[in-house]
Amino acid sequence: MDYSFDTTAEDPWVRISDCIKNLFSPIMSENPGHMPLQPNASLSEEDGTQGHPDGNPPKLDTANGTPKVYKSADRSTVKKGPPVAPKPAWFRQSLKGLRNRASDPRGLPDPALSTQPAPASREHLGPHIRASSSSSSIKQRISSFETFGSSQLPDKGAQRLSLQPSSGEAAKPLGKHEGGRFSGLLGRGAAPTLVPQQPEQVLPSGSPAATEARDPGVSESPPPGLQPNQKTLPTGSDPLLRLLSTQTEKSQGPVLKMPSQRARSFPLTRSQSCETKLLDEKTSKLYSISSQVSSAVMKSLLCLPSSLSCAQTPCIPKEGASPTSSSNEDSAANGSAETSASDTGFSLNLSELREYTEGLTEAKEDDDGDHSSHQSGQSVISLLSSEELKQLIEEVKVLDEATLKQLDSIHVTILHKEEGAGLGFSLAGGADLENKVITVHKVFPNGLASQEGTIQKGNEVLSINGKSLKGTTHNDALAILRQAREPRQAVIVTRKLTAESMPDLNSTTDSAASASAASDVSVESSAEATVYTVTLEKMSAGLGFSLEGGKGSLHGDKPLTINRIFKGAASEQSETIQPGDEILQLAGTAMQGLTRFEAWNIIKALPDGPVTIVIRRKSLQPKETTAAADS
């Protein structure tokens, strides 16, 4: 039986398609170029095969092929297989060639280099020279198809090498088109990235010549050079290149933009106070003046040498502040009796500041304040520049008498402290809470605010270090308070909430506070409290009611009471609790002295299930007063 390729009989167990027969038939694969045993001829033939950039296979096999002469040798080599093979031997050889060629084009950038060792191995085959030649032709076809499929790989490598700036010609001899050495060049410092406009000077980052080359263009050339470099980086590029570019920007950013960061932190303009939506024009003028004074004073303090006492800051007398007054302030601050007070800080209200800005040097005879207040006013005036003083005088002259009276309740407090030290008070309220006005929640006994004495509990905080707190949320106000820890000086503008100033700020909240106070007095005078212990079911939505009151609430320090019971909740169906009930204990935790936010955190932390609550209920609850309190 003849098992040669010319036979038309097929293996009944293996179905071979027509395309595979035509592709791997000896008639298609034979060509006279591969038959001579000279290695030079075979090398030139393979070089010619692999040299096609478009990947088209050579046509020498079909045009000049004379396979009939070598058909006997072909049969002698192929007949060595078993009588019934699952697959022909030439098919297995082609699969082996596929596996051998699978990893070569990926490891080497040039696909022509992968098939050069094939002729050398073909010389030592001996009697199997025809089978190896047929398999080599199959390998050539496979490599030609792979070359056609990967014809864009060198272009991608060129694009990756062109990711560097305009110094591409200088980077090519260093990289030598090798992936390992190119990544190593980036790992050693990426000098072309740092100096994009000088390609011929490729030096290490630590050399003095490189630093001298970078110094003339530090302020202008590196940022424009880095920006187009970042724009040309695709999403799938080398992450090391992106990391180096971002690190150079971060390292140069603080050095180049220190004055601008300070100007943004403490602006001289009134943009923050003007952007906030105020309730009245009078209050807007007050807020703008206070914000302007605090920002100007804070900026002046930061420009001066950092010191702990006000006496060490150089004071320039302007408009009523004489050199004798500044010397008196120095002597008073250096006195042993008042060392702690002078080191802590000082404050004055805006009415005193207005008198000094208008040039009223005789304010000492009219005012009842002591000598230290006048020294504080003069020291604040000395901190302001002439342009800021002129702008402040123009704004003060426009104010009417009713607004000028409110200047007495606004105080500018300057605290001298160590870096990282707190201001000595906490904040309550915010735009996102029930109490919209941000006030002083607590003054710590041994803090700076307590030692200075101006900032009291319940005062409204207008601005801290030139940053207005009007209309800010509670978290934003806390962030501004934390930022005040870093400088050595802190400028706080506060306002005492008197009975006269409350209608101007929040007339609705004032009426609600008076109504709730009247209701509390009427209930307490005519009712007796009864303590109940109830059990409610805690669900994912909570206990089914909302709270009001608490420490630091809108109406002051009030007990935590139930404000409203939600519809559909278990507490509404059981009717065990009512609006107005005071919560004494919640799951064994005492609720006295807690804020509403802290109480809600305790409720959220409780696990789902029954919760025991101790409440206090008035035995006699007038409906009129409770309705007024809820409104």
Curated annotation (Swiss-Prot):
One of its GO terms (cellular component) is cytoplasm. The lineage of its organism: Eukaryota, Metazoa, Chordata, Craniata, Vertebrata. The keyword Hydrolase does not apply. CDD domains: PDZ6_PDZD2-PDZ3_hPro-IL-16-like (cd06762), PDZ7_PDZD2-PDZ4_hPro-IL-16-like (cd06763). Interleukin-16 stimulates a migratory response in CD4+ lymphocytes, monocytes, and eosinophils. Primes CD4+ T-cells for IL-2 and IL-15 responsiveness. Also induces T-lymphocyte expression of interleukin 2 receptor. Ligand for CD4. Pro-interleukin-16 is involved in cell cycle progression in T-cells. Appears to be involved in transcriptional regulation of SKP2 and is probably part of a transcriptional repression complex on the core promoter of the SKP2 gene. May act as a scaffold for GABPB1 (the DNA-binding subunit the GABP transcription factor complex) and HDAC3 thus maintaining transcriptional repression and blocking cell cycle progression in resting T-cells. This is Pro-interleukin-16. SMART domains: PDZ. Residues 405-501 are annotated as: Interaction with PPP1R12A, PPP1R12B and PPP1R12C. It comes from Chlorocebus aethiops (Green monkey). Homotetramer. Pro-interleukin-16 interacts (via PDZ 2 domain) with PPP1R12A, PPP1R12B and PPP1R12C. Pro-interleukin-16 interacts with GRIN2A. Pro-interleukin-16 interacts with GABPB1. Pro-interleukin-16 interacts (via PDZ 3 domain) with HDAC3. One of its GO terms (biological process) is leukocyte chemotaxis. Residues 322-344 have a biased composition (Polar residues). Residues 30-269, 317-344 are annotated as: Disordered. Coiled coil: none annotated. Keywords: Chemotaxis, Cytokine, Cytoplasm, Nucleus, Phosphoprotein, Repeat, Secreted, Transcription, Transcription regulation. Residues 411-496, 533-618 form the PDZ domain. Pfam families: PDZ. Residues 132-144 have a biased composition (Low complexity). PANTHER family: PRO-INTERLEUKIN-16. GO terms for molecular function: CD4 receptor binding; cytokine activity. It comes from the Eukaryota. The modification Phosphoserine is found at residue 221. Gene3D superfamilies: 2.30.42.10.
